[in-house]
C-alpha cells in the first residue's frame, strides 16, 4: 500500500510540473476547418442501414450511398441474395428521356421511395420545368373564402418545379408514371382499426366523423356540408382532451381540429380510451424572440418545475357509435402518470392507408402502467370494461426511480413479458396474466435493453443486451436469443462490437448496424440461428484521404479505485509524440446517457474536430452516468445531481496524464452542452485549481428551474403526507451557489429562445459571477433554440478560440473576421 501511495504521489507531482512553463502553441484552425459538418457530409455518406421490409415476405430493400453515388438493393434473407433494385445507368437514361432534364447514374435525385404491393418501387423526381402550383392556388382560394384580404389587381398563378411520379415494376424493370392516390384521411384524425371512424379534438373537446366526411375534410376542411359529432362538452382550455403536456404555446387556436393526444382503440373499433388532462395549475414560462419583425415577440409555454403542482389526468373509455363514455378510476398516487399500453406496430402496417393506435389487450379490456410522481412505485394494471375495474397485476417498488419498457402479450393474452431492474440489473420476466411469475427469462448480472421480437410459433424471444461478455466494454450492445420455455441465452452477432439491430415482424431475421468508436460501420444480415452475412460497409475512403485517424479506446478507474470507466481519446491527426498537448474533457453527466461514444459517428464536431486545433480531447463515463450498466452504477448520483460525476472525470484525466507523456495535466479544459454545460461549469467551480478553462453551453445550471420530470426523476423529490394531503419538496445544490469559487476561465453560451433549458439558467450564473466580482465570458446566440441551429459553425470557432487562448496561449480572438467561415 505504501509503495502504491508513493507512486501515485510521484505521478500527480509530475502532472503538476508538466505545464508550468509551457510555451505558446499555434492553434491549427486550418486542419479543424477541413472537418466541418459540411465537409464531413461531402466525404461520408451512409453509415447505417434502414431495412424497408416487404409486406408479405421477409424481403427488404435499402439504399446505400458512397462516393460513387446511391445504390438501391433488395435482400432476400431466405436465399441470402442481394440484388440491385435498378440498373441505375438505364434508369437515369429513361428518366432523362421522360423529363427532358439530364441525369446520370451518380446524380439521380430520387426522393420518397416507397414499396407498393411488394411489386413496385415508387419514387419522385423533381425536375426543372415550371408548372402551376395547385396546392398554393387551393390555399389562396380557401383564404379568400375565409375572408382574408387578397392582393388587388390581376395576379399571376403561383408556379413551382414539376415533380414527376414514377413507378418501377420489379419483375419486368418497366418504368411508368403514376398518379398518386388521394389521401382518404386527414392528419388530425385518430382512425379506428376498421377505418370507419376518426376522432379528433376541437375547442378542447372530442368529436368524431365517419369515413365519408373524413374524405371530404381532406379536400376542404372548411366544407360547410361536413357532418361532425360532438362527444364531450365539458372540455375547456388547459382542461380537456388533447391537451399537450408540458409544451406548446398557450395562445394556440383551439377552434381548429387537432390530433387527440392519447387516443387508443379497441381491436374491434367499438371503444376507444382517451385522457382528459388538467393543466391549469402548470405555470407559464417565456422566451422573447428579439429577432421577430417588426417587434420582438413573447413566446409563452407551459413548463412545470420541480416541486410545483403537476397536471392531473383522467381516463375515459368511449363506446361507438353512440358516443357514451365512462370514467375509469386508475389513480393510485397523487400526481401520478399513466400510459395505456399499445399494441406494437408491425413493419407491414407501413403500407396501410392509415395507422390506428390499438390498445394492448382485447375487446374486453386493456393494460396500462402507472407510476408515482417520485417513480419509487410502479404498477402494471389490467382495466376490465365489463366490471369497471382496474386490477394491479405486478407492483414494482424501489428507493430510487423505476424505469420500464413496453409490455409484450403472448399466448393469446394469457401471458406477458415484463422488463424490470428489481434485482439491480435489467432482466426479462415471464408472467401469467393474473400476475403469477412463471420464470425469469434472463437473470444475469447484465443489462437487457429491450425486446426486439417474439416468435411464439418457434418459441423464442430476440432481445438486445450489453455487459454479458465480461471482457468487453460493457456498453457494447449485442443481439441475443432465449427460449420462452427458459434456458441459456445465445448471442447471435459478433464479439467486441456495438450492434444496433432491427428485427423482422416474425423475428426470423435481423439487420444489425455494427461498429465501434474505432471501427467503421458495417451492416449485417443476421439469422435467428446466428448465421451472418455482410451487406454493406461505410465508405470512409475520402475521410481517410483527408488525414482522418480513428480515436483510441481506453479504460481507467473511477475515484473509488474499483469501478471501471470507459472512454475514447481523440488526437490531432498531425499528432506529434514529442509534443505535450493540453487535454479537454467533453462531458455529459447522464443519467440517461454519457458523452462517451461507443459506436462510430460522423457527428464529430466537439470531439475529433476540436482535437485538430491542437488538443487531446477525451470522453469518459462516470458513476451515475449511463443506464446500460447496473442499477447501482446508474443511480449513483441520486440525491447529488450537481456533483456526482465530477470526481470521476477529474480522476480519469489524472490517470491519463500520468500514463501518457504527451498529455499536460496542468492544462485541463472541460466542455459540454445541456447537462454537459451544467457539469462543465460545476467542474470548474468545484475544482478551480484543476480545471483551467470551461466552455458551458445551454446548461441547466439551476435544476430548480429545469423541467420537473428530468430533475425530480434523477435527483429525487420528497413526498410529504400531512393531514391527508401529499406535497412534494425538492432541494438541490446549484451552480450559482458556488460561483465565487471561480479561478479559471469560463465562457457561458446559450440560445436566447431555448425553450428546453430556459436562458434563465445561464443568467442566474451570470448574476452570481458578477456579484462575486468575477471576470468571465458570455455568448448569446440570437434566435437559437437548445441545439444552436444554424449558428453551430460560428459557435465552434468561438469554442476553439477560447480553449486556444487559455490552454495553448494563442488564438484568433484578436481578429474580427472568422475567416474559416468565409472560406467554407
What do the PLM-derived regions correspond to, one by one?
Residues 51, 284, 355, 363, ...:
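Serine-hydrolase catalytic core recognition
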Residues 18-500, 506-521, 525-526, 813, ...:
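Beta-propeller folds
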Residues 2-7:
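Sec-dependent signal peptide recognition
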Residues 15, 268, 723-726:
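Intrinsically disordered, low-complexity segments enriched in Ser/Pro/Gly/Ala and basic residues
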Residues 9-18:
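Hydrophobic h-region of N-terminal signal peptides that target proteins for export
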Amino acid at each position: 500500500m505504501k509503495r502504491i501511495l508513493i507512486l501515485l504521489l510521484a505521478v500527480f507531482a509530475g502532472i503538476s510540473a508538466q505545464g508550468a512553463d509551457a510555451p505558446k502553441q499555434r492553434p491549427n484552425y486550418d486542419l479543424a476547418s477541413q472537418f466541418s459538418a459540411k465537409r464531413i457530409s461531402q466525404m461520408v455518406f451512409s453509415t447505417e442501414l434502414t431495412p424497408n421490409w416487404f409486406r408479405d415476405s421477409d424481403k427488404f430493400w435499402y439504399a446505400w450511398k458512397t462516393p460513387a453515388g446511391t445504390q438501391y438493393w433488395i435482400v432476400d434473407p431466405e436465399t441470402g441474395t442481394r440484388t440491385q433494385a435498378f440498373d441505375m445507368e438505364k434508369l437515369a437514361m429513361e428518366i432523362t428521356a421522360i423529363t427532358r432534364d439530364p441525369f446520370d447514374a451518380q446524380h439521380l435525385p430520387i426522393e420518397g421511395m416507397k414499396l407498393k404491393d411488394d411489386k413496385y418501387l415508387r419514387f419522385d423526381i423533381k425536375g426543372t420545368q415550371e408548372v402551376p402550383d395547385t396546392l398554393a392556388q387551393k390555399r389562396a382560394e380557401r383564404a379568400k373564402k375565409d375572408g382574408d384580404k387578397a392582393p388587388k389587381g390581376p395576379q399571376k398563378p403561383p408556379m413551382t418545379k414539376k415533380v414527376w411520379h414514377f413507378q418501377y415494376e420489379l419483375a419486368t424493370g418497366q418504368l411508368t408514371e403514376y398518379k398518386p392516390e388521394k389521401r382518404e384521411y386527414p392528419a388530425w384524425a385518430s382512425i379506428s382499426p376498421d377505418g370507419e371512424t376518426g376522432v379528433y379534438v376541437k375547442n378542447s373537446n372530442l368529436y368524431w366523423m365517419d369515413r365519408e366526411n373524413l374524405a371530404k375534410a381532406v379536400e376542404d376542411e372548411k366544407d360547410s356540408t361536413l357532418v361532425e359529432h360532438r362527444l364531450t362538452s365539458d372540455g375547456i382550455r388547459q382542461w380537456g382532451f388533447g391537451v399537450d403536456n408540458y409544451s406548446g404555446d398557450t395562445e394556440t387556436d383551439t377552434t381548429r381540429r387537432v390530433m387527440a393526444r392519447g387516443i387508443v382503440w379497441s381491436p374491434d373499433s367499438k371503444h376507444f380510451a382517451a385522457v382528459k388532462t388538467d393543466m391549469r395549475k402548470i405555470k407559464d414560462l417565456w422566451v422573447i424572440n428579439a429577432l421577430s419583425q417588426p417587434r420582438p415577440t413573447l413566446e409563452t409555454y407551459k413548463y412545470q418545475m420541480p416541486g410545483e403542482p403537476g397536471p392531473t389526468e383522467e381516463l375515459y373509455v368511449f363506446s361507438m357509435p353512440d358516443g357514451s363514455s365512462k370514467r375509469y378510476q386508475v389513480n393510485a398516487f397523487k400526481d401520478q402518470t399513466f400510459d395505456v399500453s399499445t399494441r406494437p406496430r408491425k413493419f407491414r402496417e407501413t403500407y396501410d392507408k392509415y395507422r390506428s393506435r390499438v390498445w394492448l389487450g382485447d375487446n374486453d379490456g386493456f393494460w396500462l402502467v402507472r407510476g408515482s410522481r417520485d417513480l419509487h412505485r410502479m404498477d402494471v394494471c389490467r382495466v376490465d370494461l365489463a366490471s369497471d375495474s382496474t386490477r394491479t397485476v405486478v407492483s414494482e417498488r424501489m428507493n430510487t426511480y423505476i424505469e420500464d419498457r413496453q409490455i409484450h402479450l403472448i399466448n393469446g393474452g394469457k401471458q406477458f413479458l415484463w422488463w424490470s431492474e428489481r434485482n439491480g440489473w435489467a432482466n426479462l420476466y415471464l408472467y401469467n396474466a393474473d400476475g403469477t411469475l412463471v420464470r425469469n427469462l434472463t437473470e444475469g448480472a447484465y443489462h437487457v435493453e429491450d425486446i426486439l421480437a417474439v416468435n411464439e410459433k418457434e418459441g423464442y424471444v430476440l432481445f438486445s443486451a450489453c455487459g454479458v461478455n465480461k471482457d468487453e466494454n460493457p456498453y457494447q450492445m449485442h443481439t441475443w436469443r432465449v427460449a420462452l420455455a427458459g434456458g441459456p441465452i445465445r448471442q447471435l452477432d459478433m464479439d467486441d462490437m456495438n450492434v444496433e439491430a432491427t428485427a423482422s415482424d416474425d423475428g426470423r431475421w435481423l439487420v444489425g448496424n455494427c461498429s465501434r468508436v474505432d471501427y467503421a460501420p458495417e451492416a449485417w444480415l443476421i439469422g435467428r440461428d446466428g448465421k451472418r452475412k455482410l451487406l454493406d460497409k461505410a465508405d470512409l475512403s475520402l475521410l481517410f484521404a483527408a488525414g482522418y485517424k480513428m480515436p483510441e479506446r481506453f479504460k481507467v478507474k473511477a475515484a473509488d479505485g474499483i469501478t471501471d470507466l470507459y472512454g475514447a481519446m481523440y488526437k490531432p491527426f498531425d499528432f506529434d509524440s514529442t509534443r505535450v498537448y493540453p487535454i479537454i474533457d467533453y462531458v455529459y453527466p447522464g443519467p440517461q446517457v454519457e458523452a462517451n461514444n461507443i459506436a462510430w459517428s460522423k457527428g464529430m464536431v466537439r470531439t475529433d474536430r476540436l482535437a485538430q486545433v491542437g488538443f487531446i480531447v477525451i470522453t469518459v463515463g462516470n458513476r451515475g452516468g449511463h443506464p446500460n450498466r447496473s442499477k447501482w452504477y446508474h443511480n449513483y448520483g441520486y440525491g447529488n445531481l450537481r456533483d456526482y460525476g465530477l470526481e470521476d472525470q477529474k480522476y480519469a484525466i489524472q490517470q491519463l496524464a500520468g500514463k501518457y507523456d504527451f498529455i499536460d495535466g496542468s492544462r485541463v479544459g472541460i466542455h459540454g452542452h445541456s447537462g454537459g454545460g451544467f457539469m462543465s461549469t460545476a467542474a470548474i467551480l468545484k475544482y478551480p485549481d484543476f480545471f483551467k478553462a470551461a466552455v458551458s453551453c445551454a446548461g441547466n445550471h439551476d435544476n430548480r428551474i429545469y423541467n420537473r420530470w428530468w430533475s425530480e426523476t434523477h435527483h429525487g423529490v420528497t413526498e410529504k403526507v400531512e393531514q391527508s394531503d401529499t406535497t412534494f419538496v425538492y432541494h438541490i445544490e446549484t451552480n450559482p451557489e458556488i460561483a465565487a469559487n471561480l479561478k479559471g476561465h469560463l465562457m457561458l453560451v446559450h440560445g436566447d429562445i431555448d425553450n428546453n433549458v430556459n436562458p434563465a439558467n445561464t443568467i442566474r450564473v451570470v448574476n452570481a459571477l458578477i456579484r462575486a466580482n468575477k471576470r468571465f465570458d458570455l455568448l448569446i446566440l440570437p434566435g437559437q433554440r437548445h441545439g444552436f441551429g444554424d449558428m453551430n459553425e460560428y459557435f465552434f470557432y468561438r469554442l476553439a478560440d477560447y480553449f486556444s487562448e487559455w490552454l495553448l496561449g494563442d488564438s484568433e480572438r484578436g481578429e474580427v473576421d472568422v475567416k474559416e467561415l468565409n472560406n467554407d
